[in-house]
Amino acid sequence: MKAMYIDAPGQVSIKDVEMPVRKEGEVLLKILYGGICGSDLGSYRGTFAYFDYPRIPGHEFSAEVIEADENNAYGIKPGMIVTCNPYFNCGHCYSC
């Protein structure tokens, strides 16, 4: 599969990457649409000091569930269209 990388500030490339292998308790998703948000733009511009490179941007997306545990606690099933809440808030860092 293909992935867009920000290799360094101002440098973007498309690379071949291995298909991820789903582990127990995880879902495998096929990304349908991805958004570009301020942190993605900041990583491209090099304005966020805590980002490492290279990085794959795109934490705001919609996707189709390809694989999921059969009896997961959330009722997620293959074929469902999903999105995620990509935010983990510590309440103490610069971003928070």
Spell out what each predicted region is.
Residues P20-G34, T47-Y94:
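Glycine-rich beta-strand-centered segment in the early N-terminal region that forms part
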Residues Y5-D7, R45, E67:
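Residue-level signal for short segments within beta-strands and strand-turn junctions
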Residues D16-E18:
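Generic structural detector for well-ordered beta-strands
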Residues M1-K2:
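Extreme N-terminal starter segment of soluble prokaryotic enzymes
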Residues S39-R45:
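Cytochrome P450 core scaffold surrounding the K-helix E-X-X-R motif
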Residues G42, Y94-S95:
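Short aromatic-enriched loop/helix-cap "lid" or pocket-rim segments at secondary-structure transitions
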Residues D7-G10, F88:
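A generic beta-sheet turn/junction motif
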Residues Q11-I14, G38-S39:
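Short N-terminal binding/cap micro-motifs at the start of the first secondary-structure element
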